[in-house]
Amino acid sequence: MTMPPSPQPAEQGSAARPPLAPLPPLPSPHGPAWLRSPVALGRATAALLGLVIAADLFAVWADHNVYDVASTVTIALVGGESADSLVRRADQADALNTAAAYAQTGALVVAAAVFLVWFLRVRVNAEVFNPFGHAHSRSWAGWSWFVPFVNLVRPRQIMAEIWDASRPAGTRSRLGLVNAWWTFWIIGLVVGRFTTVAAGKAETAQQIQDAAFQLMVADGLDIVAAVLAIVVVLKLTGMQVRKAQGDPVAAEG
């Protein structure tokens, strides 16, 4: 006669033990954070930075025109060119230079506004990736660009924190691109400020010629900084997209 199998004893207390509830998420020191796509803002920022580059190239041409007029004043006088002709050429060069300055200012203001929106977007995304990897508050991500002296160092620090939080897990921190962009940005700001003051004080043809050359150098630095900024924006945007797609925890956030 075959005996039915004896029932196996249940583990002690298993029937009465409720299933474990999921652990609550760790609190974030910067407030609620959720992933939002930075792609559209990143592309818009890159396009507007391209507009900044175009305005800077226009400014280089205008500065070169001023340089050329100032350098040929003496030669033109010796060659018999009338004073009226020289004044007309100088006025045209000055008008072109003024138009370039307005173009640069307009392009920079629009690009900076969209860049800041993108910057805040990637900062919040970075908080999802690493809530505790940011030494500065979220509000500083915006205001740090406008506070004198602070804006020379803190935006770069915040960008570095965003970059590190967005890089693939297990990879080393590589901030060479960020550092190169920030270096050219700061040098361009400083050189531009001094050359603008020098250009305003220039009176003689030689002084005007020197100031125009210095302005061309400043515009060239701005162009390099803008090119590097485009690379930073597009690369960081891509890093965040790939991290969100490949990190289950981040994707759920």
Map each language-model feature to its residues.
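Hydrophobic alpha-helical transmembrane segments of multi-pass membrane proteins
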Residues: 99-113, 143-149, 187, 216-224
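Membrane-interface extramembranous regions at the lipid-water interface
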Residues: 2-5, 16-94, 114-143, 150-186, ...
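Extracellular/periplasmic helix-loop-helix junctions in multi-pass membrane proteins
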Residues: 194-223
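N-terminal hydrophobic alpha-helix used for membrane targeting or insertion
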Residues: 45, 107-110, 211
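Hydrophobic, aromatic-rich alpha-helical transmembrane segments
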Residues: 94, 98-105, 174, 208, ...
